[in-house]
Each structure stands twice: as structure tokens, then as C-alpha cells.
Amino acid sequence: MTVAAASTEVDSGTPGAGPLSGSVALVTGASRGIGAAIAAELAAQGALVVGTATSQEGAERIGAALPGASTGAVLDVVDAAACEALVDRIVEQHGRLDVLVNNAGITRDNLAMRMKDSAWQEVIDTNLTAVFRLSRLVLRPMMKQRHGRIVNITSVVGSSGNAGQVNYAAAKAGVAGMTRALAREVGSRGITVNCVAPGFIDTDMTRALSAEQVASLTQQIPLGRLGQAEDVAAAVAFLAAKGGAYITGITLPVNGGMHMA
């Protein structure tokens, strides 16, 4: 495991002023899209952020985009030893870990009849098992602090379903169930556990769609537009800061009204 910054260590330093001043946050999958927006928003609100990417180039991009001592780290969330090493390093260098945002995820889409076992397992390993593993790893420092915020990024697909994504839908629904159970376990220790469930967000994936496809999507959305990554980031920051202190075990939809529970 390497960390992209001036050295191969997680940088130390003092977070800036803001609602999250003095806190340390770990954001997985932070090199682009929703993850990059979340990392930027938490840093803007004063947190020292460690954002992860699967490549050195991605980690360096995170470090260059974030202010102050916030930095990027190379991490494969499926690698249990690497996850443990990174969490240990953050706590060792900064003395605490306040916020975990489980954002990293993959898709391996196909119709169920054509889906290979490997495509199912890769998505479950990355989008569900890794979320559990990282959440478990941060519980010890959070319990010691008697304070912590875990925010899991799920998807509207976890509740509405989507053809060609049985693996992705199962993983995201699983994260929502895990979130509720974990929230009941750790609430007495001052730790909240919540989900943010984006709908269709303007990212690299949706930008590859045709104008006709985008028009078809927006017709399903009462607010009449695709969401922005910053919309999701604002929801995460709310749950991570003081405003979300009495909220736990919920899934906050950020979908423009396309799916209403």
C-alpha cells in the first residue's frame, strides 16, 4: 500500500475551520465523480480527508485536488490486509478517525441468465463485503472516541431494482440492511451509521449516454434533471456533521424524486 503525497505516508496536519474542523475522514473511491465531490466537500467543511483510489495516478489526483494536509492513498478495498494497514496508519498518525464514507464500488452488468458467477462475486465482494470490512475496522477507534460517523453510499437501484443489475441491486440492498443492523449495535457508543442513496447522477457514466437516453431518464425524475455529484456530497456532509448527530439507521435518497419510499 502506498500513499500519494510528498512522501509515502499519510500526511499529518491540522484541518481547516468549519463544521468538521478537527475531524479525520476516510473516503473510498475518491478519485472522480461522487467520491471526489464527497472528499472535496468534507475537506471544505474542515475535515482532514484521506481519499482512496485503486491506482497511484488516482491517489495523486486526489492529493492534488484536496487542500492542506488532506491526501490520497492507494487502496484496493477487497484487500483486507491493505484496508487494515490504512486504517491503522491513519489512527497512528492523526490519533483518531471520525468519519468513514464507503463509496468505492463497481458494476458488472448483465442479464441474470447470462451473468457469470465471477461477475456476481466481484460486485458482492467490492460493494458489500468490503463495506462491512472497513466499517468493522473503524469501529475500534470510533468506540474509543465514543464518536463516529459511517456513511455508506448505496443506490436507488437497491430499492427499485434495475434490469441487468441483479448483482449490483443485491449488494446495495445488502448494504442498507447491514447499515440498519450496525446502527442498532453501535448507537450507544456515539456512532451513527447511515446510507445515502443516489439516483441518476451526472457522472462519466451518464455522460456516455445519448441525448435521447438522458431525456428518457429525466422524464422519470420529478425535479426534471440529473443530480450532481455535489448534491450527494452535501447529503453525506450533513450526516457526517453535527446536523446528523441524532440520525442513524436511515437511507437518505438523493434522486430528485424518481423513487419515493
Question: Residue locations for each model-derived region?
Answer:
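Short, small/polar-rich loop/turn modules that mediate ligand/substrate recognition or access, typified
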Residues: 187, 192, 247-249, 255
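Alpha-helical segment proximal to the catalytic Tyr-Lys
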Residues: 140, 184-188, 245
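Active-site helix of classical SDR
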Residues: 135, 171, 179
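Conserved glycine-rich Rossmann-like NAD(P)H-binding loop of the short-chain dehydrogenase/reductase
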Residues: 45-61
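Substrate-binding pocket helix/loop in short-chain dehydrogenase/reductase
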Residues: 111-112, 116-124, 150, 217
